[in-house]
Curated annotation (Swiss-Prot):
Residues 334-592 form the Protein kinase domain. It comes from the Eukaryota. It holds the Pfam family Pkinase. Residues 1-25 form the signal peptide. The active site is at residue 460. The chain crosses the membrane at residues 281-301. It is found in: Cell membrane. One of its GO terms (cellular component) is plasma membrane. GO terms for biological process: defense response to bacterium; defense response to oomycetes. This is L-type lectin-domain containing receptor kinase V.4. The gene is LECRK54. InterPro entries: ConA-like_dom_sf, Kinase-like_dom_sf, L-type_Lectin-RKs, Legume_lectin_dom, Prot_kinase_dom, Protein_kinase_ATP_BS, Ser/Thr_kinase_AS.
């Protein structure tokens, strides 16, 4: 039991940070660490140099009750690209240290961890897993391509050639200096007092069952209660780029299931020859002269003829979506006269692209929008690269003077909020249409949270931001509040934004949006679509009905369908409607711990998973926070159709993830 609780405690702390930035802090870089072509590197093009990148906050490693190191797991992705394809520099290491960064460290064979004076000193309290690409006789290295476990010094107490064991148990070599992405997993078991290290290639379809290194030793004498974690690398007479893609730390010894895209890292930069430099300088001088002449002519003609000024800045080159000319949009919208509506960030106009019959919707960001540029950048950098059938497609953008424009596919049926509530002379949505809309938006959110290369938090899920196409398919739009994150990073943001009634309570308290706050808003969205009612309905001057609370009350009274509009409730849909209402209450629960993630929501709506029998007891329980700290995830109890599980009140209804 103490091991389980200890694992939970360290999990809750360590799960808060991953990759290079997180809610608690950042990787603090020292020495030659920096960035090259958008990738974090521990070393640059300098010889005999070292670089370090350490978390800026301490990590508790020990169970205070018995002063033993608790179980933990570390997974990180790296690549090493040396200037000589056949010869490495010195290498890199994952380091657990009592200090943030290691002062007085040396480069070359010491990997930026130790120096000649303190190498092997028992007072160091340093644990390292080295990825060594240089054979140093003084440390007993077996070759120039090996992995080792080091305690307080550079002489490895456990080592092996770099490689992995395939499914048949056969050893396969891996080159640490190939320049390709490699994965290292470090697992320590408190119970078995065993440290396992596995090296593998993310390109393989399986994860090795057998570790490369296995050290049977209690780490408690060497690791203090509070430590720092990070990475270090060094160069010698040969230089190399040591790339860090991402890293993850968790409590327990389970290997996280990580599905990342595999990038191609840039090779070591080649030095230019003297002749090349002379030609380059001469060419640049000539180009500069021509540019000056051209600029003078351009200014002259600009002042005489050009009336529309469109500035193409550096950030626009990297955004991806097509840039439209202002004149093109002006003509398409007939001078911005076909107004479709007005939202929190500007007006939306209908248009038809010149030379085609393609209809578009153009959003013009208002002049008085204080965060106009910020929201504009967020939207084009996010939705412009997303491709999903239930997301509104961004065709391109335009910037004219101080005005910002976004060009979308035109949705002829407008926004969903126009169809939800009973209005005179308006056809009501059938239950089948409502259920399909719910599943469409669930699929879109699952894509944003779990299936794209980066995690996207929408932050403003509501019927007004759901558009209906000509086939009555629902598409999620308005990414003006969206936030983008690398996979594996803690997806949180510090600015409270969104529509008030859809904002989760923890977002109001902490100001940090997560995938869980999106799930909360989606739960309310499900209730609003299913019931055909607004979230807040005023029955009398002094009587307001909160839809989520009322639905739960109807459920407690034994008839959850009482919350539904009469025209919907009387359709032949009782079981399906009851499922959606219960799932909506669950997703919009005040306690983050029992909300399912969107992948589970999609499976439940599709009939692949079922809700537990005692879900009402779980929703009503008051001690959810205590469950999340002491119990296993309840989603593991969710069973396939035909085998409904029963949950106890000591299990949280979520899995710890992004």
């Amino acid at each position: 039991m103490s091991r389980t609780i200890g694992s939970r405690v360290i999990f809750l702390i360590l799960a808060l940070f991953c990759c290079t930035e997180n809610s608690r802090g950042k990787l603090v870089m020292q020495g030659s660490a920096g960035f090259f072509k958008g990738y974090r590197t521990l070393t640059s093009t300098k010889k005999h140099a070292y670089g370090q990148a350490f978390e800026d906050e301490i990590v508790p490693f020990k169970n205070s009750a018995n002063d033993t190191v608790t179980s933990f797991s570390v997974t990180f992705f790296f690549a090493i690209a040396p200037e000589d394809k056949h010869k490495g520099a010195h290498g890199m290491a994952f380091v657990i240290s009592p200090t943030r960064g290691i002062t007085g460290a040396s480069a070359d064979q010491y990997l930026g961890i130790f120096n000649k004076a303190n190498n092997g000193d028992s007072s160091n309290h340093v644990i390292a897993v080295e990825l060594d690409i240089n054979k140093d006789e003084e440390f007993g290295d077996i070759n120039d391509n090996h992995v080792g476990i080091n305690i307080n010094g550079m002489r490895s107490i456990k080592f092996a050639p770099a490689g992995y064991y395939d499914q048949e148990g056969q050893f396969k070599d891996l080159s640490l200096i190939s320049g390709s992405l490699l994965r290292v997993t470090i697992l320590y078991s408190q119970m078995e007092k065993q440290l396992n290290v596995t090296l593998s290639s993310p390109e393989e379809a399986y994860y090795p069952n057998k570790p490369l290194l296995s050290l049977n030793q209690d780490l408690s004498p060497y690791i203090l209660e509070n430590m720092y974690v990070g990475f270090s690398a060094s160069t010698g007479s040969v230089r190399a780029m040591h790339y860090m893609l991402s890293w993850f730390v968790h409590g327990g010894v389970d290997v996280p299931n990580l599905d990342l895209g595999i990038p191609t890292f840039p090779p070591y930069p080649k030095e230019k020859s003297l002749v090349y430099r002379i030609v380059l300088v001469t060419s640049l001088a000539l180009v500069l002269f021509v540019a000056l002449v051209a600029s003078a002519l351009s200014i002259f003609f600009y002042r005489r003829h050009k009336k529309v000024k469109e500035v193409l800045e550096e950030w626009e080159i990297q955004c991806g979506p097509h840039r439209f000319a202002y004149k093109e949009l002006f003509k398409a919208t007939k001078g911005f006269k076909q107004l479709l509506g007005k939202g929190g960030f500007g007006q939306v106009f209908k248009g038809t692209l010149p030379g085609s019959d393609a209809e578009i919707a153009v959003k013009r960001i208002s002049h008085d929008s204080k965060q106009g540029m910020q929201e504009f950048l967020a939207e084009i950098s996010t939705i412009g690269r997303l491709r999903h059938q239930n997301l509104v497609r961004l065709q391109g953008y335009c910037r004219y003077k101080e005005e910002l424009y976004l060009v979308y596919d035109f949705m002829p049926n407008g926004s969903l909020d126009k169809y939800l509530y009973h209005r005179a002379n308006q056809e009501q949505l059938t239950w089948n249409q409502r259920f399909k809309i719910i599943k469409d938006i669930a699929s879109a959110l699952c894509y944003l949270h779990h299936e794209w290369v980066q995690v996207v938090i929408h932050r403003d899920i509501k019927p007004a931001n759901v558009l209906i196409d000509h086939q009555m398919n629902a598409r999620l739009g308005d990414f003006g509040l969206a936030k983008l994150y690398d996979q594996g990073y803690d997806p949180q943001t510090s600015r409270v934004a969104g529509t008030f009634w859809y904002i989760a309570p923890e977002l109001i308290r902490s100001g940090r949006a997560t995938t869980g706050t999106d799930v909360y808003a989606f739960g309310l969205f499900m209730l609003e679509v299913s019931c055909g009612r607004r979230l807040i309905e005023r029955r009398t001057a002094s009587d307001e009905v909160v839809l989520a609370e009322w639905t739960l009350k109807c459920w407690e009274n034994g008839d959850i369908l009482e919350a539904v509009n009469d025209g919907i409730r009387h359709e032949d849909n009782r079981e399906q409607l009851e499922l959606v209402l219960k799932l909506g209450v669950l997703c919009s629960h005040q306690a983050v711990a029992i909300r399912p993630d969107m992948s589970k929501v999609v499976q439940i709506l599709g009939g692949d998973l079922q809700l537990p029998d005692n879900l009402l007891d779980i929703v009503k329980a008051e001690k959810v926070r205590m469950w999340s700290e002491t119990s296993e995830s309840v989603l593991g109890v969710l069973t396939s159709q035909g085998s409904i599980g029963t949950l106890t009140l000591t299990e949280p209804f979520t899995s710890r993830g992004r």
